[in-house]
C-alpha cells in the first residue's frame, strides 16, 4: 500500500474513532483494529483533540487500546489538559467577578462556556479567555488604558494582560467582513447581549459560576465565528467539535429529535425556550441526522426574527454554508473523511 493510501486510511480510522469518542456512534468501530495509534496521536495533537480521543480510549477494551508507553504518555497529556481547564475555570470566575465589581456586565464567549457542553468538561483543550463587556468601546478602553496602558485596540476586542492566562476583552462578540451584514449583526448583538450577560452557569466541582451565552445565541454566534475564520486564520476540528456540541445542546434544549424533523417544514411550528422563539425548516442536505440538519437552522433564525430585509439571510445563504456542512459531515455523518481545504471551488464570496 502506498504512503498516501496509508495516510488516508488512518485519517478515516481517526474520524471513525472520533465519532465514537463524541457519542455520534455507540459501537466501537471495526476499523480500529487496523489503527496506527502513533498516527492517530499525531492527528489528535495537531487538531488539539488529545483529551477528546483519550475520553474514548478509556472506554476501549485492553486489546484495542494503544501500547503501554504511548498510553501512559497520552494519559499524562490528558491530565495536563485537565489541569489547564481547572486553571481556566478558576481564572474565568476571577475575571468575571473583577469586571462585575468594576461595573461591567459580562459574558464569557466560547472557551470554558463551550467546555461545559462536553461529556467531560475537562477533556477540551482550553485556550484563552474571551469575555464580552457591556458599556461600549469608549468606557471599556478607558478602563483598559488605566489598568494596562498602550494596548492595541482592534475592531472587536483588545488584549488585557493582567494575568498569565491570556484575556481578550470584547466590545462586540464578533463581526462580518461585509459592511451591510456586519451592521445587521451588530444591531442584533445590541438587542440580545444584555440577556446573555444575565445567563449564569455553574462550573464543575464547585469552582463557581460564570456568565455564558444561551444556546439560542451560540448556535448563531459560533457558526458566524467559524464562517469568518475560514477566510482568515482557518478552522480546525476543535472548533468544529465545539459547534457540534452547541448543536447537540440546541437540540436538547428545544427538544428536537429525528422524529420532529418533519415538523420543520411547517412554519407554524414554534419552539420556545429561554425567551426565544425558533421556527426552523429542514436543511437542504436532508441527511436525517439531527445535528447535521440543525446546521441549516441559524439562517432561519435570522429570517424569522426579521433581521434581514426581504428575507436575505444574515449569516449566509444555504449555499454559502455548503463548505461548513461538508466539514461538519466528517464528524457526524457516515461517510469517509471530507477534505475541506479548497474553499473557492464552488464559492462566491460577497456575490450579492
Q: Residues of each region from the PLM?
A:
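Ser/Thr/Pro/Gly-rich low-complexity, intrinsically disordered segments
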Residues: 280-282
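Conserved NTP-donor binding/palm subdomain of two-metal-ion nucleotidyltransferases/polymerases, i.e.
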Residues: 2-127, 132-275, 286-352
Amino acid at each position: 500500500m502506498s504512503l498516501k493510501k496509508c495516510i488516508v486510511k488512518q485519517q478515516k480510522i481517526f474520524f471513525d474513532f472520533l465519532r465514537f469518542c463524541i457519542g455520534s456512534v455507540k459501537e466501537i468501530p471495526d476499523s480500529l483494529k487496523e489503527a496506527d495509534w502513533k498516527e492517530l496521536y499525531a492527528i489528535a495533537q495537531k487538531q488539539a483533540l488529545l483529551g477528546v480521543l483519550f475520553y474514548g480510549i478509556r472506554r476501549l477494551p485492553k486489546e484495542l487500546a494503544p501500547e503501554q508507553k504511548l498510553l501512559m504518555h497520552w494519559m499524562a497529556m490528558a491530565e495536563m489538559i485537565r489541569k489547564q481547564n481547572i486553571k481556566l475555570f478558576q481564572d474565568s470566575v476571577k475575571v468575571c467577578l473583577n469586571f462585575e465589581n468594576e461595573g461591567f456586565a459580562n459574558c464569557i464567549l466560547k472557551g470554558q462556556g463551550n467546555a461545559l457542553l462536553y461529556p467531560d468538561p475537562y477533556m477540551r483543550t482550553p485556550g484563552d479567555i474571551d469575555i464580552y463587556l457591556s458599556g461600549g468601546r469608549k468606557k471599556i478602553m478607558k478602563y483598559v488604558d488605566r489598568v494596562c496602558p498602550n494596548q492595541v485596540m482592534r475592531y472587536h476586542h483588545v488584549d488585557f494582560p493582567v494575568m498569565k492566562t491570556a484575556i481578550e476583552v470584547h466590545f462586540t462578540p464578533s463581526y462580518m467582513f461585509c459592511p451591510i451584514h456586519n451592521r445587521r449583526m451588530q444591531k442584533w448583538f445590541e438587542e440580545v447581549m444584555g440577556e446573555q450577560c444575565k445567563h449564569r452557569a455553574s462550573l464543575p466541582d464547585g469552582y463557581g459560576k460564570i456568565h455564558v451565552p444561551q444556546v439560542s445565541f451560540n448556535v448563531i454566534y459560533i457558526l458566524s465565528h467559524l464562517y469568518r475564520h475560514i477566510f482568515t486564520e482557518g478552522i480546525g476540528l476543535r472548533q468544529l467539535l465545539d459547534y457540534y456540541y452547541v448543536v447537540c445542546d440546541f437540540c436538547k434544549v428545544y427538544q428536537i429529535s429525528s422524529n420532529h424533523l418533519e415538523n420543520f417544514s411547517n412554519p407554524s411550528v414554534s419552539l420556545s425556550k429561554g425567551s426565544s422563539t425558533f421556527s426552523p425548516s429542514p436543511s437542504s442536505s436532508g441527511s436525517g441526522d439531527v445535528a447535521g440538519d440543525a446546521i441549516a437552522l441559524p439562517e432561519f433564525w435570522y429570517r424569522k426574527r426579521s433581521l434581514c430585509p426581504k428575507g436575505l439571510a444574515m449569516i449566509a445563504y444555504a449555499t454559502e454554508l455548503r463548505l461548513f456542512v461538508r466539514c461538519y459531515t466528517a464528524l457526524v455523518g457516515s461517510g469517509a473523511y471530507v477534505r475541506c481545504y479548497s474553499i473557492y471551488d464552488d464559492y462566491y464570496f460577497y456575490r450579492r
